[in-house]
Amino acid sequence: RTKALLVVHLYGKCAFTDELLSICEEHQLLMIEDNAQAHGCLWKGRRTGSVGHAAAHSFYPGKNLGALGDAGGVTTDDEELANIVRALGNYGSSKKYVFDYVGQNSRMDEVQAAVLCEKLKWLDRDNERRVAIATKYVDGIQNTAITLPTKDYLANDVFHIFPVLCAKRDLLQRELHQRSIETIIHYPIPPHKQKCYSEWNALALPITERIHREELSLPLNPTMTDEEVEMVISNVSEIKL
């Protein structure tokens, strides 16, 4: 009964594989991309957000391509779908005072669009800096209590965040906070444990749950200086866990 496959490029990592595309082709499934965290990421010469039937993008200020306020978009080469999406974001209306769908007002204002057009010019440069910082972390952090992304992981990634795993994650976060290094957990509660999915709360997904217990995101953004990067590396390396 499956009609579509939702591919999530989480943390800036491209989620495409040849096998995934073959499955969609074999079973005639639509591929929908969640490209909220992977703006500008390349896979075999193509950008994420341009491979599937449609893709959703977040332009929240913290994203690789971020506006000054809340904003988002959908890309597709399906003209009919594009018209439906435009209508849904315009109260469900494609013609003034005529409503084809139950929609909402989610139009992007001109100021956000102008900011994004300007920042788009610098996206590749900023992503290159993100990858450079991630590479420094992978090469420089020496702490056996922490699992880092592998060298292979660096490919096809624009590092919206830099995730590590640590069995003593909360202790690591406290130690770094005391050293004025702020970190974030992405994400503390897995989807199947959320209140809104109460029918799935009893489901056991041990790998998912371990990741949620152990994940910690180290500081990473293209404005970081080399000195700040080295401070993160040295402090993470010397903390005893």
For every predicted segment, state its role.
Residues 1-67, 73-75, 217:
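Active-site phosphate-binding strand-loop segment of PLP-dependent enzymes
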Residues 69-70, 111:
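A conserved catalytic-core signature of glycosyltransferases
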